[in-house]
Amino acid sequence: LTGKKVICLNMPIRQIKNEYDRGNEHIEWLKKNYPNVTSAEVNLTSIFEEMEHTYDNDIQDFLTMANTRARLRMTTLYAYAGHHKLLVAGTGNKVEDFGIGFYTKYGDGGVDVSPIADLMKSQVYALAASVGVTSSILNARPTDGLFADGRTDEDQIGATYDELEWAMLYIENKENYELNKNQKVAMQIYQSLNRA
């Protein structure tokens, strides 16, 4: 939308096929609709596997290795950004970044600019729909793509973004109405992550 040079990187690490295909579809849509957008693919699988062979087995739990993937991608983003004299743009929104801290420190949280950080998740969807982002992106269950088992953000967090956004706004707006059972669960999840 700005007309500035943009390079989209697809950085698969043993990526699940539908995640990989959806990412490529979105990159192709961006290139078709915005002449300032180019792309590159950097398959990081072999580098990640070398790290797995190097690390002691006892530290290779799901979360450690998921965060390792995010940090490997961040390093790659900065290699491209540095070479092309560009900035790394983040994709975190207000709910993820400031509401529950759902990002990897020095991974997807390691960015130069955060253009959608002040938008609630629902606003991100509205913005995406208004510029014509494809339905496969808009309708996909949000995932960070960092786990080999394909878990979604909701699987990891225990609540949907709609529920988390509701809880965040309930607190911000100093609401004071009686909560139903589902709202209480969502509020508990939100508050536990927000205070962490």
Question: What residue spans do the PLM features occupy?
Answer:
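Walker A/P-loop NTP-binding motif
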Residues: L1
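ATP/NTP-dependent adenylation/nucleotidyl-transfer catalytic domains that generate, transfer
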Residues: K4-I7, R14-Q15, H26-L30, Y34-S46, ...
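Conserved donor sugar-nucleotide recognition element shared by glycan-biosynthetic enzymes
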Residues: E19, R73
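Conserved SAM-binding loop
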Residues: G23
